[in-house]
Amino acid sequence: MAFDTMTAPPPAGGKWVRCTGPQLRKMARAGLLWLEQNRDHVNSLNVFPVPDGDTGTNMLLTMRSAYARIELSEETHVGKVAGQIAQGALMGARGNSGVILSQIWRGFAAGLANKEAFLAADLAQAFQGASDTAYKGVMRPVEGTILTVIREGAAEAADAARKSDDLRFMLERVLERCQQALERTPELLPILRQAGVVDSGGQGLVYIFEGMLRYAQGKLSLDGQQVAVAPAGEAVSAQALAVPEGGSLEFPYDVQFILTGRNLNVHEVRARIDAMGDSTVVVGDDRVIKVHIHVKDPGQPLTYGISLGHISDVVVENMQEQMEELVHGGAAPLASAAGAPPAVAP
């Protein structure tokens, strides 16, 4: 029997063929909650691009910002809900992983822009858009990361759509494929193999998808009740961390900000910012651009941004200090910024 009511995922055993805006909102909350439950595990895997132990925190802050845009919304149009999620993720994106996650949501939303509700074929298209947009947002895409995980997940979504119109079936297949891709990340990225871990950003994305599926299966409550936490596994030891020879990072400062202006050229901004350091992710449009980069001099990208318009949500983190905290057994400092979104209440 098909199940397509406005506000709830399918009951156990039901076939789910149509997803509405309220359903997507609940799934986004489920993904956020499951990531929140497993943030420490994601942080413990963080060795690339810098072993600063904050990937889980950055992805969580990004998801909180995304969900804050829709938490009280009564919108039923699934394309508009997806667009709100994407906008919230972009504005609140933290760190390299958070900005890439925002681009996954951006591509996902673009694929659903004109949909009142989505079917399996629409969801497969959205997954492909998520993968394509994420790759385009990174100056030099690296395999063995969150990019690989979303790309393989998108491929599986397309195959699942050809076999069934059941959305839950697709989510099950996508999660399984993403988990398999995650397990193979050490084969693609030597730094992960050296540390004996899978990619932290990819793991964070898997947790988000797992939360969504658990809710669709009726295995995850959104009413504030305690939920089971996935096994955390072992944290990366200080000896296994990919600490640069000599202990110093070439680009020790993580700089993030939002640039707003008129007639901005995102391609030109990306090229200029990229010349200042590495781990560049610059995304947006002619009015709003999100900038993330690792640099020697944090003043350089900030000054450039000011020359083009107005900068806000500025975050500057000393990754050298974060790395040393991890190496010496301390906890990595949490990402911080003025106006960071609050935790989602149960």
Residue ranges and their predicted role:
Residues M1-P346:
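N-terminal loops that bind phosphate or other acidic moieties
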